[in-house]
Regions:
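Conserved active-site alpha-helix within GNAT-family acetyltransferase domains
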Residues: 120-124, 129-155
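A short beta-loop-alpha structural element at the N-terminal edge
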Residues: 2-14
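Short loop segments at secondary-structure junctions
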Residues: 70-71, 100, 163-167
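Conserved acetyl-CoA-binding loop-helix of GNAT-fold acetyltransferases
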Residues: 92, 97, 103-116, 127-128
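C-terminal "cap" of GNAT-fold acetyltransferases
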Residues: 149-187
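Active-site rim helix/loop that mediates acceptor-substrate recognition in acyltransferases
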Residues: 15-78
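A conserved beta-turn-beta hairpin within the catalytic core of GNAT-like acetyltransferases
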Residues: 82-92, 102
Length: 187
């Protein structure tokens, strides 16, 4: 497996990664008994989110990575600029692994690469809204333990922070993602 920075020509493969990784959420949300021809599901919101993030000032190309297996992109992660009050910090997400490559350590490899790269750039911390059983294995803990809360109260239960080497305990307050996280998906 190779973890490398995202390149310009990777866009379609990255869209396919997030389409595969998050399609189950759409399928389960739209499940039910229907008659008639199958209607294709729309792209998961993560596909459009990555596209909008690329066009935003918070996009950080040095912290956007893909995982390749046999020259095939099977995973993607991006870190973008966020803020806690006046302090610049990072937000993780989305992170996705194609369903045919899951349970092979791809997600863990992407997480370790992203954390290491952010730490090497002297970033103080990374925030995310994510699964409480997955992210603690990478050192994430509830943001409230460090006095950091998301600016959307309904995110609080799954909001987590990973302090890095440059972390300063003065960083407290409300966490704000890059603007595209708050925009509805394009039709």
């Amino acid at each position: 497996m190779l973890i490398r920075r995202e390149r310009t020509g990777d866009t379609a493969a990255i869209d396919a990664v997030h389409r595969s990784a998050f399609a189950d959420h759409l399928a389960s949300a739209g499940s039910g008994h229907r008659s008639g021809p199958a209607v294709p599901l729309p792209d998961p919101p993560e596909v459009d989110l990555v596209r909008r993030l690329r066009d935003h000032s918070g996009w950080m190309p040095t912290l956007t990575m893909v995982a390749e297996l046999h020259n095939d992109i099977v995973g993607h992660v991006c870190l973008t600029r966020a803020a806690v009050g006046p302090f610049p910090v990072l937000a993780l997400g989305p992170i996705g692994v194609r369903t045919d490559a899951q349970a092979r350590g791809v997600g863990s490899a992407l997480m370790h690469a992203a954390l290491g790269a952010a730490d090497a750039l002297d970033e103080p911390l990374i925030g995310l809204v994510g699964h409480l059983d997955y992210y603690p294995r990478f050192g994430f803990a509830p943001g409230t333990r460090l006095g950091i809360v998301p600016d959307q109260s309904d995110w609080t239960s799954h909001f987590q922070i990973r302090p890095l080497t440059a972390y300063d305990s003065e960083i407290k307050g409300e966490f704000r993602y890059a603007d595209p996280f708050y925009c509805p998906a394009s039709p």
